Amino acid sequence: VLAISIVATGMIALRQSALPLDLVRGGLSRPAVSEAGSGALIALQLALLVVLQWPVGNWVAKRSLRFGLGTGLVGFVIGCLLLASSAFWSGGMVLISLAMVPLAFGEAAFLPSAAEAMVEETPLKHRGLSMALFSQCFAISATGAPLLAGTLLDQQGHGVQLWLLMAVICLAVMPLLKTVRPRYTAGLQATPLENDEDVPSPRIASLR
C-alpha cells in the first residue's frame, strides 16, 4: 500500500507543480498557455475535487479497498494519457480540461481508500507508525516527483514523456492491489480485537 500511495501522491504533486509548467511551455503542437489560463485550470481541478470528494468517497466506501485503490489508479492513467495526447494537437487545451475530470475522480477515490487500507492492513499495535509512514508519502512525493518532472521537461521541452511515464508507473503498481487484504468483512464486521482484560496492565502486573 505504501508503494501505491507514493505513486498516487506523486501524481497529485505533479498536478500542482509540473502541470502548470507544462501548460506555460506548450506542447509539440499545443500553444503555450498564459499564467492566467494556467491558474484558471488549476482552480478548475481543485473545484472538481471539492465537488467529487464526498460522492466518490462515499461510493467507493461501499465497495472493497481494492476497488477504491484501483479506481484511483485507473483515473490517473486516463488523465495522464489525455495530458500526453494534448501535446500533439493545437486544441490540446480541450484534452487537458477533460483530463481534469478523471484526475480529480481518481484522487477523490484513492485518498480515502488508501488511508483506510493503511489502518486495516496494519496490526493494531503498529497502526500509529503506519499512519506516520503514510503521511510521509506526501513528503517523499513532493520532493522526488517535481525533481524528476523538472529534469524531463528540461530535456524534452514538453510533458509527453513525463505523463506517459506516470501512466506506465500507475499501470505497473496495479498488480500490488492483489496484496491488499482488508481485516473487515463485506458485512462491515470488524475482526475481533484484543480485549482489554486479556492485555495485562503494567500496574496490575506489578501488584501480582
Language model regions located:
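C-terminal ends and interior cores of transmembrane alpha-helices
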Residues: 74-90
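Multi-pass alpha-helical transporter architecture, strongest
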Residues: 115, 165-198, 205-207
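Loop-to-transmembrane helix entry/capping segments in MFS-fold secondary transporters
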Residues: 35, 122-134
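Helix-to-loop junctions at the C-terminal end of transmembrane segments
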Residues: 51-65, 153-154
